[in-house]
Amino acid sequence: MEQNILNSILDKFGDGDQERSDIRHNDSGDENDNHSDHEGNHGNNECCEGNEDGDKEYEVDVEDMTDEQYAQFIQEQQEPKIKSGGNTGVKGVLSDYAEHREKQKQKYLQKKYETQKMLEKMCFTTRDQPPPTEEENQLDSDDDDLERIRKARMEQWKSKQQITSDVKKPEKKVFGYFKQIDSSQYIHEIDNEPPNVFVIIHLFQNYIPECVLLNQQLGQLAVKYRYIKFLKILSKEAKENYHDEALPSLLVYIGGKLLVSFVPLTEELGRNFDQEDLELLLSSYDIIPNPMKAKNSNWETSLSRKRPESDDDNDD
């Protein structure tokens, strides 16, 4: 009886030990298994973190993506933040992307507008080109048309100035300097002046003798005619593909618009021009007073002062 009871107890506890042994054999211990699982997960996390670092270092070209691809890309980049924080969703990402695209578009349009505005202000005649070919020489009639348009524009401007002066003569702004500018200042220097101010700009290169000569003369005119704004700019700075054959170029603006352009100036004055030649040319467009009239006026004034003395001598 006792043996039967003992065998029953051994069988009972033996099965239980085997089950626990099997559990420990399969699980290798609860604490160790949990620790192994934790290390495995930690290894996976490190791997993911490594991938994230790799993704950060790799620059993705988003310009070629569609809106949906870009939204998915942004969502993947922000996925850890979305899990831990608020979820912006695809609509939020698309909204941010649309705002980014709009800013880029506005920036591009602004740059395009400024470039176009500068080119409009530098609308030279057809002489701002390389030496003409035989076919181009047959287009002389076009130059005549341009000359007629230029004269008509001058007459229109003169009549407008006459009307303005009859109503009210605005105060003149004083300059008295000859300043060099760059392309970023070009439009600003022309537009930000009163409508009655002439702005004369010389496009030049230092290795061209006529440009050096003109710079010397313009520097003297800037002191003599202080109500005119005299500027100079390197031709390649103003226009990248500007031809040296068109130098020296002299442009005259008033009221923010191109009044007349001499491109090149040597076609009007030749290569051995002096300051008086330049003044006569500018005075022919009423930009400055005629220097010959001023000389004649001074001569007549001087002569009139001497006449009474000569008359008195004759009477004696």
Swiss-Prot record:
Chief localisation class: cytoplasm
Record keywords, A-Z: Chaperone, Chemotaxis, Coiled coil, Cytoplasm, Sensory transduction
Organism domain of life: Eukaryota
Compartment list: Cytoplasm
Coiled coil feature spans: 102-156
A GO molecular function held by the record: protein carrier chaperone
Domain Phosducin: 95-290
Region listing for Disordered, in residue ranges: 1-61, 293-316
Gene Ontology CC: cytoplasm; cytosol
GO biological process: chemotaxis to cAMP; chemotaxis to folate; heterotrimeric G-protein complex assembly; protein folding; protein localization to plasma membrane; regulation of G protein-coupled receptor signaling pathway
Extent of Basic and acidic residues compositional bias: 12-41
Renumbered residue ranges of the record's region Thioredoxin fold: 175-316
Biased composition (Acidic residues): 49-61
Role summary: Required for normal chemotaxis in response to cAMP and folate. Required for the heterodimerization of the G protein beta and gamma subunits gpbA and gpgA, which is itself thought to be necessary for prenylation of the gamma subunit gpgA and its association with plasma membranes.
Family per similarity comment: Belongs to the phosducin family.
The name this protein goes by in its record: Phosducin-like protein 1
Organism annotation: Dictyostelium discoideum
